[in-house]
C-alpha cells in the first residue's frame, strides 16, 4: 500500500493542473508579501474600511492584520534560519581567530624559554699589534644610585665622580654661572680643530684622520646625539636656577641610564686631550716618534707561554701549511713604512657611541701602531738576511721547516717537483742546442747520425714524458682528474722518468768521449748503441748448426784434396806393393771335395757400384776403384814405417780400411744429394766410432797365427770383399782336392777367417744402415734400392745352393 500511495501522490503532484495551481499560489503569496512590504514601509499602519462599524473595526483590523502578517511570519522564519546560519559561521570564525591567537602566544612563550637567536655585527678579537686596553675592557654595569630621595642628574653626576677609579683629577662642576657651558663649547671646538694637527706630521694637506673624523661625525645617529645635548641644556638650566630664580623641571632619572657614563666619557676625553697636547712638540709631531728606533719593545704585550725556552711549535704531518700571498710593491711599502693609511677601516670595526670616544681611540691606536711598525721596520732592517731567506722560502713549507731545510732534505712536494722538472728541461735543452751546433763541423756521417739520434731522443723525452709529468703535477696541486694524484704518485713517476734521463745523459757522455778522441772510434759506439740483443736460446741452436756445417765442409775439403793427389799415390802404391799380394788378392772357398778361387773386389768398388745403381748413373770400375784406393793409400802413408805389433797393426788397418770405405760412401752420397749433406756429415763421426768398436771386438776374438801382419790384414780385407761379391762373381776356379792336400791346414784357417770376416761385414753393413738418417729412406727412392742391394749381397750360402756337384 505504501508503494501505491506514494505512487499516486507522485502522479497527482506531477499533473499539469497541480503544477498550475502551485504556480498561482506562489504568485499570489509573493504579491501579498510585496504589497504588505510596501504598505509597512510607507504608512506603518493598516487600512481602515469605512463601511465597517466602529465596534467590529478593531476585530476586523486585528484579523486582517493577522492575515496580513502570516506571510511575514513565514518570511521571518526563513530569515531567522539564514541569520542563524550566518551567526554560526561568525561564531566559528571568531573561535578560529581566538585559537590562532592562543597558538601565537604559546609559540612566543616557547621561544622565550628556548632563547631568542640574536643577529648582530661580529666584532673579532683585536690582533696583537693593536691597542687592547679599551677594546678588551668591557663596560661594567653601573650600580644603582644609593639615594632614597629624589634623584637628579646633578646628584648622579656627583656620585659617579666620587666612585670613579683612576688617578685623573677632574675639577667638579660648580654652580657658579653660565660661564662653564661657554667654556665647554670652545673646548669642543678646539678639540675638533686640533684633531687635524695630530695627524699632519710631514704633510701639508688634510690627513686621512681628519676625513675619518668628519665621516664619523656624519654617521652618528640623532638618537645618540640627543641625550648629550639634553644633558648639557639641563646642566645649564640647573646652573642658572639660583641666578634666575625660575624653578626647572627635573625629570626623574633611572639609576641605569646612560647619561652619567657619557658625562664621565667627556671628562676622560678632556684628560686625554690635555695629555696629548702636553706630549706634542711645537710642530705638532709626537715626541715618542722621534725616539722610536731607540726604544725597546713593550714588555706589557708579551704573553707568558708554558712551552720551554727554545721550543719551536710545528704543525702536524698531514696539516696543510698556511700559504702567504705575495705582496705587491705598493702593499709591501705600506706594510714596512710607518704611516696611518691602514686605519681607514677602523671605524667600521670598532664603532663608538660618540665622536669623542672614537677620536680618543684613534689617537691612541695611531700612537701604538706607529710604535709597533717602527719597531718592526727596525727589526727588518737589522735582520734583512733572515727576512729575505724567509720570503724566498718555498711556498707551502712551514717556517720551522724553512729554517731547518738547509741541513735536511727538502720535502717532495709540488714546488719541489716543479723545480726539478724545470731544471732538467733547461739542462737537456741546452745539451740539445749545443750538439746541434756541432753538426756543421767536418765530422763523419756516423758521428752526425749518432748526434741526431741522441738529440732526437732527448727532445722526444722533453716533449712527451716531461709534459705528462707536468700535467700530473698540475692535477696534484689543483686537485683535478678522475682520481686524486698524491706526491707519492709523482715521486714514483719521476723515478721512472729518471731512468730515461740517465740513458740520455749516458749518450751525451759517450758523445763527449767521442769528441775527445777526435771522432775516431765512431764505429764502435754506434754499433754498441744500435745493436740489438739476440735471444740466447736461438743463438745456441744456430751456433750448433754453424759448427756442424763447418765440420762437414772441412771433411769434404779433405776428401777433395785426397782425390787431387790420386795419380801419384796410385803409381807409388803399385811400385811399393810386392808381388805376393797379387797372389793373395783372391778369395778361396774350399767345400771339402772342391775348391773355388775368385778375384777380390774391394769394398769401395762395391759401394761405388751400389751408388751408381742407386742414382741411375753407371760408373765403370776403372773410375771408382782408383778413388777408393787413393783414399786408402793416403791413409797408409801416414802409418809409421817400422813393423808394429801384429794385433794392433791389424786392428788399425781394418779400422782405416772401413773408414776409407765409409768416407768414399759419404762422398758419393753428398755429391748428387746436397740436401742430405748436413745430416750425413753430422752422423759420420758416430758411424765411424761404431765401426771401430765392432771391428776391434771382432779382431780380438779371431785366432790369428804369428805371421806377417800386412798379409793377414790383406787376407781379411779380401775375405770380406770376396764374401760380398761371391754371388755376382763369375771367375770361378775349381780344383781337385786331392792335388791340393798340402794346403789343407791353410785352407781351414782361411775358411775360419773368411767366416769371421763375413760376419764382420754383415754387422758392419747392418750397423751402417741403422745409423743412416731416417729421412733418407722416406724421401729418396734411391735409399730403397740401396737397402735392397745389401740384402742381396747377404743372401749367399756355403752349401749346394751356389754350385751343385756330384760326389766322386
Swiss-Prot record:
Extract the ranges annotated as region (Disordered): 134-282, 377-413, 629-654, 735-757
- What stretch or stretches form a coiled coil here? 88-119
What is a single cellular component term in the Gene Ontology annotation? cytoplasm
Keywords in UniProt for this one? Cell cycle, Coiled coil, Cytoplasm, Cytoskeleton, Nucleus, Phosphoprotein, Ubl conjugation
Q: Which domain of life is it from?
A: Eukaryota
Name its cellular compartments.
Answer: Nucleus; Cytoplasm; Cytoplasm, Cytoskeleton, Spindle
> Which residues are modified to Phosphoserine?
66, 70, 201, 328, 598, 607, 612, 620, 743, 797, 806
Q: Where is the composition biased (Polar residues)?
A: 382-392
Q: In which tissues is it expressed?
A: Expressed at low levels in normal resting liver. Up-regulated in regenerating liver after partial hepatectomy.
Basic and acidic residues composition-biased segments: 135-145, 180-193, 232-241, 249-278, 642-654
In the record, which positions carry Phosphothreonine?
Answer: 337, 386, 617, 728
Modification(s) after translation: Ubiquitinated, leading to its degradation. Decreased phosphorylation levels are associated with the differentiation of intestinal epithelial cells.
Example GO BP: signaling
As for family, the record states:
Belongs to the SAPAP family.
Provide the assembly information.
Interacts with CDC2. Interacts with the C-terminal proline-rich region of FBXO7. Recruited by FBXO7 to a SCF (SKP1-CUL1-F-box) protein complex in a CDC2/Cyclin B-phosphorylation dependent manner. Interacts with CDH1.
Task: State the function annotated in the UniProt record.
Answer: Potential cell cycle regulator that may play a role in carcinogenesis of cancer cells. Mitotic phosphoprotein regulated by the ubiquitin-proteasome pathway. Key regulator of adherens junction integrity and differentiation that may be involved in CDH1-mediated adhesion and signaling in epithelial cells.
The protein's matches in PANTHER family, at most eight in alphabetical order, are given as: DISKS LARGE-ASSOCIATED PROTEIN 5 (PTHR12353:SF1), DISKS LARGE-ASSOCIATED PROTEIN DAP SAP90/PSD-95-ASSOCIATED PROTEIN (PTHR12353)
Q: What is this protein called?
A: Disks large-associated protein 5
Amino acid at each position: 500500500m505504501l508503494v501505491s500511495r506514494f505512487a499516486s501522490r507522485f502522479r497527482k503532484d506531477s499533473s499539469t493542473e497541480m503544477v498550475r495551481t502551485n504556480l498561482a499560489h506562489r504568485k499570489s503569496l509573493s504579491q501579498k508579501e510585496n504589497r504588505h512590504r510596501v504598505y509597512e514601509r510607507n504608512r506603518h499602519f493598516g487600512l481602515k474600511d469605512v463601511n465597517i462599524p466602529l465596534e467590529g473595526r478593531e476585530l476586523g483590523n486585528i484579523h486582517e492584520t493577522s492575515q496580513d502578517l502570516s506571510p511575514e511570519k513565514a518570511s521571518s522564519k526563513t530569515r531567522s534560519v539564514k541569520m542563524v546560519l550566518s551567526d554560526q559561521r561568525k561564531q566559528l570564525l571568531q573561535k578560529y581567530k581566538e585559537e590562532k591567537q592562543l597558538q601565537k602566544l604559546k609559540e612566543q612563550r616557547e621561544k622565550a624559554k628556548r632563547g631568542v637567536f640574536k643577529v648582530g655585527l661580529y666584532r673579532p678579537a683585536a690582533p696583537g699589534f693593536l691597542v687592547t686596553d679599551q677594546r678588551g675592557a668591557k663596560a661594567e654595569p653601573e650600580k644603582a644610585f644609593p639615594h632614597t630621595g629624589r634623584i637628579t642628574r646633578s646628584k648622579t653626576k656627583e656620585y659617579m665622580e666620587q666612585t670613579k677609579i683612576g688617578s685623573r683629577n677632574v675639577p667638579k662642576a660648580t654652580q657658579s654661572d653660565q660661564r662653564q657651558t661657554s667654556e665647554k663649547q670652545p673646548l669642543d671646538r678646539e678639540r675638533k680643530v686640533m684633531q687635524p694637527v695630530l695627524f699632519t706630521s710631514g704633510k701639508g694637506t688634510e690627513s686621512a684622520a681628519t676625513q675619518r673624523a668628519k665621516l664619523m661625525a656624519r654617521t652618528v645617529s640623532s638618537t645618540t646625539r640627543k641625550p648629550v645635548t639634553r644633558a648639557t641644556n639641563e646642566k645649564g638650566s640647573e646652573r642658572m636656577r639660583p641666578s634666575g630664580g625660575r624653578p626647572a623641571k627635573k625629570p626623574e632619572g633611572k639609576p641605569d641610564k646612560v647619561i652619567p657614563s657619557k658625562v664621565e666619557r667627556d671628562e676622560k676625553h678632556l684628560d686625554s686631550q690635555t695629555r696629548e697636547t702636553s706630549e706634542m712638540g711645537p710642530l705638532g709631531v709626537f715626541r715618542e716618534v722621534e725616539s722610536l728606533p731607540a726604544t725597546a719593545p713593550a714588555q706589557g704585550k708579551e704573553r707568558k707561554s708554558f712551552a720551554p725556552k727554545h721550543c719551536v711549535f710545528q704543525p702536524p704531518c698531514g696539516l696543510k701549511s698556511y700559504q702567504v700571498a705575495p705582496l705587491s710593491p705598493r702593499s709591501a711599502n705600506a706594510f714596512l713604512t710607518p704611516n696611518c693609511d691602514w686605519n681607514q677601516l677602523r671605524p667600521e670595526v670598532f664603532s663608538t657611541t660618540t665622536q669623542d670616544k672614537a677620536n680618543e681611540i684613534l689617537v691612541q691606536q695611531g700612537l701604538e701602531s706607529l710604535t709597533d711598525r717602527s719597531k718592526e721596520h727596525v727589526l727588518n732592517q737589522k735582520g734583512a738576511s733572515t727576512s729575505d731567506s724567509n720570503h724566498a722560502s718555498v711556498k707551502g713549507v712551514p717556517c720551522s721547516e724553512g729554517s731547518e731545510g738547509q741541513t735536511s732534505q727538502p720535502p717532495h712536494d709540488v714546488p719541489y717537483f716543479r723545480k726539478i722538472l724545470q731544471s732538467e728541461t733547461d739542462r737537456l735543452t741546452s745539451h740539445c742546442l749545443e750538439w746541434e751546433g756541432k753538426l756543421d763541423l767536418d765530422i763523419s756521417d756516423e758521428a752526425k747520425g749518432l748526434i741526431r739520434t741522441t738529440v732526437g731522443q732527448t727532445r722526444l723525452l722533453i716533449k712527451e714524458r716531461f709534459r705528462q709529468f707536468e700535467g700530473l703535477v698540475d692535477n696534484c696541486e689543483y686537485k683535478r682528474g678522475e682520481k686524486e694524484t698524491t706526491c707519492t704518485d709523482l715521486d714514483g713517476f719521476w723515478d721512472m722518468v729518471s731512468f730515461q734521463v740517465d740513458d740520455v745523459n749516458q749518450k751525451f757522455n759517450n758523445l763527449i768521449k767521442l769528441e775527445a778522441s777526435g771522432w775516431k772510434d765512431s764505429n764502435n759506439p754506434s754499433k754498441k748503441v744500435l745493436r740489438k740483443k739476440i735471444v740466447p736460446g736461438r743463438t745456441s741452436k744456430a751456433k750448433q748448426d754453424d759448427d756442424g756445417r763447418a765440420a762437414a765442409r772441412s771433411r769434404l775439403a779433405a776428401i777433395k784434396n785426397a782425390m787431387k793427389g790420386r795419380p801419384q799415390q796410385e803409381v807409388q802404391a803399385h811400385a811399393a806393393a810386392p808381388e805376393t799380394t797379387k797372389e793373395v788378392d783372391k778369395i778361396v772357398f774350399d767345400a771339402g771335395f772342391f775348391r773355388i778361387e775368385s778375384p777380390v773386389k774391394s769394398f769401395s768398388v762395391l759401394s761405388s757400384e751400389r751408388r751408381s745403381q742407386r742414382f741411375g748413373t753407371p760408373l765403370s770400375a776403372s773410375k771408382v776403384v782408383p778413388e777408393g784406393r787413393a783414399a786408402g793409400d793416403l791413409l797408409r802413408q801416414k802409418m809409421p814405417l817400422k813393423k808394429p805389433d801384429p794385433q794392433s797393426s791389424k786392428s788399425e788397418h781394418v779400422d782405416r780400411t772401413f773408414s776409407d770405405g765409409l768416407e768414399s760412401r759419404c762422398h758419393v752420397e753428398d755429391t748428387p744429394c746436397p740436401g742430405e749433406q748436413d745430416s750425413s756429415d753430422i752422423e759420420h763421426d758416430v758411424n765411424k766410432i761404431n765401426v771401430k768398436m765392432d771391428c776391434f771386438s771382432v779382431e780380438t776374438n779371431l785366432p790369428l797365427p804369428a805371421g806377417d801382419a800386412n798379409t793377414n790384414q790383406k787376407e781379411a780385407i779380401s775375405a770380406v770383399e770376396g764374401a760380398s761379391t761371391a754371388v755376382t762373381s763369375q771367375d770361378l776356379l775349381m780344383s781337385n782336392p786331392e792335388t791340393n792336400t798340402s794346403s789343407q791346414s791353410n785352407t781351414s784357417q782361411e775358411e775360419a777367417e773368411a767366416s769371421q770376416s763375413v760376419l764382420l761385414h754383415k754387422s758392419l753393413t747392418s750397423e751402417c744402415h741403422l745409423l743412416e738418417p731416417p729421412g733418407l729412406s722416406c724421401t729418396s727412392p734411391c735409399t730403397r734400392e740401396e737397402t735392397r742391394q745389401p740384402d742381396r749381397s747377404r743372401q749367399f750360402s756355403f752349401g749346394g745352393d751356389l754350385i751343385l756337384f756330384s760326389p766322386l
